[in-house]
Each structure stands twice: as C-alpha cells, then as structure tokens.
C-alpha cells in the first residue's frame, strides 16, 4: 500500500508525483472579500512542502456573494490565484479549484444577514449610550431581518432547484464556465465540479420536482451537470476536470442520509455518463446537503 501511495499516477493530462491529495474543504483562511491572502497562501504552501501532490481549493464561488468562501468572478482576481499556483508548482504540487454556485445566497440572503448585523451593532451602541428607544428600534430591525433571512435561506436551499428558471440555470452554468476560464489563465491545473449542493439537488429525485427537461428521469435530472461539464471543457480545454459525485446512503434503520445526490444504483449509471462525456476523475462522497 505504501509503495503505491508514493508512486506517480497519470490523470487526464496531469501527472501527479504521488497519490497524496488534500481534498476540498472550507478553511476560513480567505480574506473577507474571498481572495487568497497571505494566510491561505501559507497554509496551502505548507501542504505542498510536506509532499502533497494535489490540492483542491474548496467551495470557490464564481459570482459575487456573501458566502464566506474563496471567490473568482472578476479578471482582477486572477493574479492572486496565479500566485497560489506558482507557489504550489515550486514544490511539484498540482492545484484545482472546486467550483460551486452558492444557492443559499440567492436573491440577497447574505445582504439581509449583513444588514441585520449592522442593526445589531447600532442597537448595542445605543444601549451603551443609554438610548433605550433607539436600542429597541435597532434591535427590532435586527430581529426582523434575521428571521426573514433565515426563512428565505431555508426556502432557497429546499426549493431553488425546482423553482429556478432555465435562464437562471443558464446564467449559473455560464458563470461557472467563465470561472474555469479565469482559473486556466491563472495557471490552475484542474477544475473539480462540486456535484453536491445545486448540481446534487438537481440530480436528486428527493429534491428535484421539476417538470421540464431538467426533471423526472435520471437522464433529465443529470442533464444540467453534464451541460456544466461540457461548458467547462469548452471554456478551459487544457484543464483536467473531475467531478465530486455525492451518494445518498442508507442508515442501519433504513432511513436515508443526505438528499442532494444519487442513490447507489443511479450513481453507477451517472458515473458512466460522466465517463462518456469526458470526465477525467470522479471523487465519490457522502451526500450531505
């Protein structure tokens, strides 16, 4: 096992020096605007120095959003990702961006949460100044915004996949493809398609209740994910592309764990579809959204 772990492996057009990979996760080390700052750069560089051959930066949003994750939506952000790629390449470590659409920030949920925070701060200042009336006023605003934001948050996560228009889905697909183009320009080696969240929800018979070409049969429910893959390959043809494939598993008591993904039998069929569409690698994961 150890000898295999340290052997090189070819995936798509990339050769990894070994099989040690750092999987995607949200570190919280990014700057407030989602940029890759000194703390993020140092964290990932240490992993590369330690011998890791492949690092996937998790939850990179291709749009401006309040989501506390990395972001790459503007040409001006390319340079910071180039610095990251250059730093990791110095240690013969490849780097990928895991792209996802922050569906829980649909139509300004994040803005409502931020405005609630501001009102809360104003309430605290008024209270400290013994201005009871102003404190109560701002606290009421804070409470109402918070309640409304989280009600909308719950609705969006549960229903956006079914309610989104084809135009919305097309815009999201295009933003992901353009993000991949920017990543390629920055010298990033690969793209991981986040198959959980929005894409997993579209694939899921538990969450997808659409009646158009994106709902119903397995072919329809997986159509959008395959369109996203094709859009990325067209926008960034030199990049290796992998897919995070979430599996809905069955608990010992018979209940299901996860909703945004596919049950095992459908997942096998979808993996074959991905292979036929030209995917380079599949990362199998537990469905958890």
Task: Say what each PLM segment does.
Residues 1-289:
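Flavin-dependent oxidoreductase catalytic cores
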């Amino acid at each position: 096992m150890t000898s295999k772990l340290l052997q090189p492996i070819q995936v798509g057009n990339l050769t990894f020096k070994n099989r040690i990979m750092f999987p995607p996760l949200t570190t919280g080390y990014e700057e407030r605007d989602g940029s890759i700052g000194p703390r993020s750069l140092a964290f990932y560089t240490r992993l590369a120095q330690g011998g890791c051959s492949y690092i996937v930066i998790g939850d990179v949003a291709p749009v401006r959003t309040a989501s506390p994750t990395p972001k790459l939506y503007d040409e001006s952000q390319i340079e910071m990702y180039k610095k990251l790629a250059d730093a990791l390449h110095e240690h013969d470590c490849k780097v990928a961006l895991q792209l996802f659409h922050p569906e829980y920030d649909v139509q300004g949920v994040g803005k409502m949460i931020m405005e609630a925070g501001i009102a809360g701060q104003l309430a605290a200042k008024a209270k400290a100044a013994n201005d009871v009336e102003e404190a109560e006023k701002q606290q009421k605003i804070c409470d109402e915004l918070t309640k409304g934001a989280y009600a909308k948050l719950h609705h969006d996560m549960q229903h956006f996949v079914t309610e989104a228009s084809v135009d919305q889905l097309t815009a999201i697909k295009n933003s992901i493809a353009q993000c991949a183009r920017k990543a390629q320009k920055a010298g990033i080696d690969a793209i991981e398609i986040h198959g959980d969240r929005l894409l997993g929800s579209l694939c899921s018979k538990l969450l997808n209740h659409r009646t158009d070409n994106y709902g119903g049969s397995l072919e329809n429910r997986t159509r959008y994910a395959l369109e996203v893959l094709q859009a990325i390959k067209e926008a960034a043809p030199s990049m290796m592309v992998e897919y995070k494939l979430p599996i809905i598993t069955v608990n010992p008591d018979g209940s299901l764990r996860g909703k945004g993904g596919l049950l095992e039998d459908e997942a096998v069929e979808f993996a074959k579809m991905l292979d036929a569409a030209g995917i380079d690698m599949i990362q199998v994961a537990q469905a958890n959204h």
